[in-house]
Amino acid sequence: MQSAWRQYFIYSIVAIAFIFILARIILLQGFNTDCFIFNLDKCKTNLSEIAEKRQIASRSIDTNRGTIFDRNNEILAMSLPRKTLCINPSLLYNLKKEDLKKYHPLLEIIGEKKSNFLKIVKKFNKRKEYYLRRKVSDKTALKIEKLNLKFVYFIKEYQRVYLGGESFSNVLGFTDIDDIGQEGIELSKDDVLSSTKGIKKIRKDNLGRAIETIEIIKQPIAGQDIKLALDKNIQIIGYNILKKYVDKFSAESASLILIRNKTGEIISMANYPSFNPDLRHEMSGTKIKNRIITEIIEPGSTMKPFLIFAALNSEEFSKEDIVDTTPGFIRIGGKIIKDPSNYGKLSLGEIIERSSNIGAIRVAQQLEKKDLWENIKLFQFGDNLYTGLSGEQHGELKHHSAWDDSQQATIGYGYGISTTLLHLCNAYTILANHGKYIPLTYEKIEDISSIYKEEIADEDLSKEIIGFMTRVVQNKNGTGKRANLEKY
């Protein structure tokens, strides 16, 4: 009797445990406590809702970044649709090793190691979406689609392509894998060019692929286009000239900037060496920098026109004054500064024409430090030009109170002052506009009447300096005769 009772007790315990385990399995499979024989209608409803939830998902809607055009509507940078390969690690994680072998052909196509793929699945096993390969080619996408694998699908993204090539790359800059501007104009105008992703509700098949768009929850917003002042044809010609002469003279680098002085538009801005914008491994080091705005230089003899402007704008000199450069050399701060030969007595215009260092030093030494500093400062050396170009450096023109006699003398021929090529061209643009300042811009100006102008330097004196500069290329003693062009 006691034995039978024990047997009955053990059977009861086993039965209760079995019922408990069965109930737990049912609950884990997605049933809830209302799904019993007394609530069949409610049970069917719940099962339908669960199935519906498993088929429904939300996906982001990507759209294109704004296009960059040159002044003649030539496309320089644009975004093209690409497919991004996605997997569902949460479902792949539960597959048997034998089933995972079906994914080996996929890994071969994209060049992914099997061990790394397993690590990804394990590490991100809670995630329902993982980007296995971003922005694959159409050819690669087609090969993958033919495999018809579960839990593998594509979403649409956009990839930046640069039609301007190397000649524009360190001016336009580039974006990262997420289409966010990292350098150049892509960074400067990122808030304008950037798109805003949308959201949609989709229905999936049993492979995890979107088969139907149920609802657009949030519309995507495409980035705005911009039109640059740059001219593609001139830019390419200029870049090729830079490349030719850097290679010819084994120079480290060269830069070119061309400004339409009446509007302030930058028509060309080229640097060599540059980089291929389609090869991401080249996007590092000095090649990616726009040296026209980032590289600090001593302007040298290009400062002499501004020195003579300062001289004529002061009470110390007149147009008729003569400067004696004999004997053709001078000691400044322990160094001997020379002219190519003893030019003797020179007018102020001839100091520019012959690019006389001795003449420039003698003029600078006779000026009051304050007068010299104020006149050079008129041309915005050391100022923020507010072009909006990312990475713009300002250079430095130290206050005259910090100058010693040596620095005062050397500024006359462009040493002891630091600037950029952009600032130097801005200063010459003011001269070319006869003393009027017009802000420089890399964007095309559609309405000329809207151009801001401010007279900051004497008009007649600016014209006088332009005349002196013309003699540099036209007169027989000019140091720039080879730059003289007919009909220009």
Name each model feature, range by range.
Residues 1-280, 370-380, 481, 485-487:
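Periplasmic/cell-envelope proteins involved in peptidoglycan metabolism and beta-lactam response
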Residues 75-77, 204-214, 256, 260-301, ...:
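Beta-lactam-recognizing serine transpeptidase/beta-lactamase-like catalytic domain environment
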